Amino acid sequence: PLEKDESINAILPVKEFSEEEFVFMVTSSGTCKKTSLSNFSRPRKGGIIAIELRDDDKLVGVEITAGKHDILLFSSAGKSIRFKESDVRSVGRTAIGVRGIRLATKDKVVSLIVAESTDPILTATEKGYGKRTQLDEYRTQARGGSGVISIKTSDRNGQVVGAIQVTDDDEMMLISNKGTLVRARAVDV
């Protein structure tokens, strides 16, 4: 049972609770946390804490990682940052974490990508605009910086709603808040 104001934000398939793998989490405020997957091997009936959140913060993305890839964070204002996963040290379950990206006042993180391949990144805005960018165009920088502009946000484009890593063969399904689905090939963006 969940608390009154609590909801499920992520589901992860786990075969083995290995010490060589990690749970990497990011919150809307840009906080990142990396915890050994083995720390989650003994859950309690009432659940266990995965990350300690501040009042106005929420969990945005969770991935299982090998600890050796690059991390990309994308914000609603079109900013992004790429840094080494090794820049975030592994901490216990109840820790808050560290700053992944420095955000402007009303900006928030909307996507987490663990770059396990060199495939391009597709960024989409709330008004249906998208941009496909080669991964190597996102330069690696120190964790906690302001990042770079990934896509321009404007009245025409709207805010960024998400970013995903795609291949030329991928097809995407974009679904509006009214339930309308648009299908597009990644290579056409």
Each language-model region and where it sits:
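Short, structured "edge-of-domain" segments at secondary-structure transitions
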Residues: P1-V189
